[in-house]
């Protein structure tokens, strides 16, 4: 598992680095074999030990091996996790740079900044939950997920249909039958 913190949002005018108006976020990614795995992204008050302690309590397993950078807040917050391995970030060592969690963070930032064109702190946790859910279910073989995916692919954008058109997208013949309740 890899864990890291990051900030999202716009910087204050003229400010450099991590601006105070940015929202602190915490992220963890399960480095499961064969590309499967899950992630969790959470809004936090700050990136201190207290925030990491709560994040660890809610989302991490004490038996996990957690790879992280050498941030002191993480050291204090996750001190009860025996599998915590912290290293200084080294650009020459690809594994020490936490590639999985940084890829998820980068994809999350692109997702919210590209799809929503502006962030609302009020809705940011919902965006994080959506991104985490999509990442965690990206290779699901669940029948319900497959059906949902197929239905999304059948969607015809309104921009491609005239306002007065009554044409509906043709449903494929292979859609599963609806679920029925036994004894009803």
Spans of model-derived segments:
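Residue-level recognition of single "structural anchor" positions
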Residues: 1-184
